[in-house]
């Protein structure tokens, strides 16, 4: 019982432990992804950031930049982020849910789910 309670307490209030998804952010996902992909993207968001808008990974040695926000967009997408979000400060822009999901939508439209595969960076 203590383990079950610990498991429940370790999941952020805005995340769904049962579905491992981010229902709070699904309306935003629906604006940038086809309806059939929204449940998948919600689960990816949960896996990437546990539904935390301001999630920031350590700086990657390979790029010299962190992965940022709900979808953990790689800092290497700076040019795309500047174009899509019309902001120069890439990290600050990607910490905003609207921008982060908009960039994720752009990536999906230009490569599908491959951007979130475990091997996409190799």
Each language-model region and where it sits:
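Export/targeting segments at the very N-terminus of extracytoplasmic proteins
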Residues: 5-52
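N-terminal export and membrane-targeting signals
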Residues: 1-3
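Catalytic and binding regions of secreted/periplasmic enzymes and modules that target cell-wall glycans
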Residues: 19-20, 28, 39-41, 54, ...
């Amino acid at each position: 019982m203590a383990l079950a309670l610990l498991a429940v307490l370790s999941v952020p209030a805005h995340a769904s432990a049962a579905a491992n998804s981010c229902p709070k952010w699904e309306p935003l996902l629906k604006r940038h992804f086809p309806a059939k992909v929204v449940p998948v993207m919600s689960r990816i968001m949960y896996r990437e950031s546990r539904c935390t808008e301001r999630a920031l990974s350590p700086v990657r040695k390979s790029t010299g930049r962190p992965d940022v926000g709900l979808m953990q967009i790689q800092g290497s997408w700076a040019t795309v982020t500047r174009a899509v979000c019309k902001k120069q400060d890439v990290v600050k822009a990607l910490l905003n849910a609207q921008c982060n999901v908009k960039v994720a939508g752009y990536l999906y439209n230009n490569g599908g789910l491959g951007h979130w595969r475990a091997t996409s960076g190799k």
